[in-house]
From Swiss-Prot:
Keywords: Mast cell degranulation, Secreted, Toxin. Belongs to the bradykinin-related peptide family. This is Protopolybiakinin-2. GO terms for cellular component: extracellular region. Expressed by the venom gland. Shows a high potency in mast cell degranulation (is 10-fold more potent than bradykinin). GO terms for molecular function: toxin activity. Negative results: does not provoke rat ileum muscle constriction and does not show algesic effects. It is found in: Secreted. The lineage of its organism: Eukaryota, Metazoa, Ecdysozoa, Arthropoda, Hexapoda.
Amino acid sequence: DKNKKPIWMAGFPGFTPIR
């Protein structure tokens, strides 16, 4: 899932950063 990507992916739309 794109929402499971690491926080460095937070810069991309649709991606949720993992805290």
